[in-house]
């Protein structure tokens, strides 16, 4: 947007155009720094080094709403499954914080042996809050982003969110995604 304004002014007011280009450059630097911070948050070192069971408590602790966490994983799923799972949890906790007006969140990560999904089964994530409910997939991009991310690994997402009754988000990810 700023560069477009600069292009319009370049012939009429080169000094103003230069100021706009400098502004755009600063905005680009700021966006890159924000992207680095987001990327670090989406795939932190603890996830890479120690796995989902170690990374989930870190994500839960960062959430301003108190989180009760249960991790029932006998071993590490695939790295891809862990990355998708961590993203799903972070996005779900962000949605709770922004929209749910919840006082608590329950987060369960568990392995489900499901022969129909291969011998390894599924990684199931369940995020339950006691908030206001009424989550609408048609509003915002958060839930769409989750569906897209899960769809890319043949996973699934269900959201149960009756108005006034909180929200239950359940994600299934192939263990060896």
Regions found by a protein language model. Name each.
Residues 1-177:
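Coiled-coil dimerization/phosphotransfer module
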């Amino acid at each position: 947007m700023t560069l477009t304004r600069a292009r319009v002014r370049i012939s009429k007011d080169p000094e103003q155009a230069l100021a706009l280009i400098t502004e755009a450059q600063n905005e680009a630097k700021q966006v890159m720094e924000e992207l680095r911070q987001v990327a670090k948050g989406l795939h932190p070192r603890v996830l890479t080094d120690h796995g989902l069971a170690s990374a989930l408590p870190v994500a839960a602790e960062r959430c301003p709403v108190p989180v009760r966490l249960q991790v029932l994983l006998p071993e590490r799923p695939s790295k891809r499954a862990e990355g998708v799972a961590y993203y799903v949890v972070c996005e779900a906790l962000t949605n709770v914080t922004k929209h749910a007006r919840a006082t608590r969140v329950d987060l369960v990560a568990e392995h489900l042996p499901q022969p129909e999904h291969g011998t390894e089964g599924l990684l199931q994530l369940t995020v339950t809050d006691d908030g206001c409910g009424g989550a609408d997939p048609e509003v915002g991009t958060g839930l769409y982003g989750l569906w897209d991310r899960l769809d890319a690994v043949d996973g699934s997402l269900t959201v149960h969110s009756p108005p006034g009754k909180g929200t239950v988000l359940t994600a299934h990810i192939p263990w060896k995604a």
